[in-house]
């Protein structure tokens, strides 16, 4: 098969560069005008297999998957399968099965030897568990894993519970990736209490110099509205209310989730898609008192008139 090659530009020849072609089967550079073989015995550095799509290329590649920060050893080690079958797919006899069990035990011990390995293995399992419960995307879990690894390298986990530091790393990752999750939402899935997670979060920001953007109440609007089954019109109105509140300086020092919840409550009343303060507060992860206070502030300061039933 003949095709143009970028590498042919390095071949010193009077043949015009755009006339040089490469014969992959013969390993030769040829001038298409004169038929002269410019260079031969070229070693093909590419794979011996063919792939026509990126998916086929990835499937046929033998170099393994990319590094995975959510695995304690980043996925670099090998695993002995638990299927108890040989290379031909045949079930192992009882004697071989016991041998495979012993190999697995020793292989696991070899993978997790140091105290740091054991710490990371436990932490990454906890991170995966919380991430799945919160339905977090892989990018956020990867970011949380990186933050936790930095904390381990700096010795910040020593003397603190792994669960609280993992939860704090997840919250920091959500903030960095602008994913609307409150500290209460994350803390409810850990053995640590909210106060401990918040303390670890502040520690990570201070010691690791992790920069997080200021939370925007509008980031919470879509998620809360979707969970409540509200329309796009309600979301749009809630976002407009938040923009007006920002312009009036009402958002400074306020919990963004509480502001978003109050804005959605007002918008749902304006569009006659009524939800109770209790329903909205539960979904937003705030108290009814917070929703009620923010509701009063927004309606009074922005002079929003709520229609009566």
From Swiss-Prot:
GO terms for cellular component: transcription preinitiation complex. It holds the Pfam family Zn_Ribbon_TF. Keywords: Repeat, Transcription, Transcription regulation. The keyword Signal does not apply. It comes from the Archaea. GO terms for biological process: DNA-templated transcription initiation; transcription preinitiation complex assembly. Gene3D superfamilies: 1.10.472.170, Cyclin-like. One of its GO terms (molecular function) is TBP-class protein binding. InterPro entries: Cyclin-like_dom (IPR013763), Cyclin-like_sf (IPR036915), TFIIB (IPR000812), TFIIB_arc (IPR023484), TFIIB_CS (IPR023486), TFIIB_cyclin (IPR013150), Znf_TFIIB (IPR013137). Sequence repeats lie at residues 125-208, 219-300. Stabilizes TBP binding to an archaeal box-A promoter. Also responsible for recruiting RNA polymerase II to the pre-initiation complex (DNA-TBP-TFIIB). HAMAP family: TF2B_arch (MF_00383). PANTHER family: TRANSCRIPTION INITIATION FACTOR IIB, TRANSCRIPTION INITIATION FACTOR IIB-RELATED. NCBIfam families: PRK00423.1. Belongs to the TFIIB family. This is Transcription initiation factor IIB 1.
